[in-house]
Amino acid sequence: MENYQSLSDHDLKILYEEAKETMDEYEQLQLVVKLNMNSLYGVSATIGYSLVDYDIAEDITGSARHYAVLVDIAINKFFTTWANDPENLEKVKKFVPNAIALANFKNYKRDSLDDLCIYGDTDSRYIDVYRIYTSLILVDDGNGNPVNMTFPPNTPEGNHEIAEFGVQLEKYFIAEIIANSIHNDIAKRGANDGYLKMALETISRKCVYQKKKKYIMSLIYKDGKVFDKPKLKLQGVEIKRGELSNKMKSIIQVLINKLILEDFTIDQIRGEIVKLFKYIKVKKDKSMIYRATSVSMKDIYKNDKGEWVSNKTHIQVKIAASWCNFIERNNLTDQYQRPFNGQKMNYYYDVTGNVIGVPDDVDMTTVPGLPEPDWNKMIKQTLVKPIMRYLFDENDFDDKDIDNFIMGIKKIEL
């Protein structure tokens, strides 16, 4: 490689193809190792496999959580005092040339809004780059006065700037914090060093975190590559799960794109929801507003009146019983069958408050005589409430909260 400058264009192309092939092979090998290790971890905690060993699974989970939390605390503590060391400013100037001062991260409180590590799992931590960018680095305003930096605009150039900032922040600060905190803890325990690794994987422009394993973010960087256009990463949210109709999930996807990728304001999203609310009520398409779940037939029986009933009160039993009674009352048993135990069923609430269930292999728009849905209730449940979870820090909203949001009435904090 030392003599590459003397190579001909032809030889350089050959060298490039060989290097590319080697990198592809290495990345595939990495993927195989990762999949194998994840599989071993998974089967160690699953009773159906011969390799099950709960002690091993607990050790792996506990160790990962321990070091993730350790790194979380170390990162926060570093930024609470980083302005006190002049060397840190010199490092920052390497990627923010007009920086003239640093500010310490004040009021750090673990697992609160005043925590730079805003989300995490057993093997990861998500750092608030926005806060570091806009409040912990001061630049020259042109007259020698220190001012906070303005976050780059939502443009390809702005996203590249954010991604580069995140990469440099990791290079000059975060990587060292992670390495030192892990090394010191391992040394303290007398364990073997060199087997734990943490690295920068993704950088996101905008994120919404709901709770454990439920989040959505706009990726602008992943595994060493900056994207020309942000890509959504979704984990555990409604549009990834089967509890809503495909039509409603598509509608929510459009609204999420506007919120996360196009920086729509809350009022703009509310305006879109109001228009959709009116449209769905006019269209009266049942296949848009149902929810879905698996049902149980084990505890359902016919009473003396010939009605399907159950001593259980959970929703899955009610859904199954409603369909059994509906097809018998309407003489439709020759066209439709009773659900089997564990079957997926779609359901909605009608105008009388009763739950109405239809097996997922039946098109509910073609079933004759189905009761009229409570359109207001179902649109709130399947459209408004899921979107509100992305807009606000809370996860639970009652009917009054939803009505106030639709009408644009802001909650007054007392």
Positions of PLM-derived features:
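Active-site-adjacent bridging/hinge elements
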Residues: 2-14, 35-49
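Short, conserved non-catalytic motifs in the polymerase core
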Residues: 47-60
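DNA-dependent DNA polymerase catalytic subunits
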Residues: 1-11, 17-29, 61-65, 69-120, ...
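Short acidic/His/Gly/Ser-rich catalytic and metal-binding motifs that mark active-site loops
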Residues: 42-48, 127-128, 136-137
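Ligand/cofactor-recognition surfaces for anionic moieties
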Residues: 32
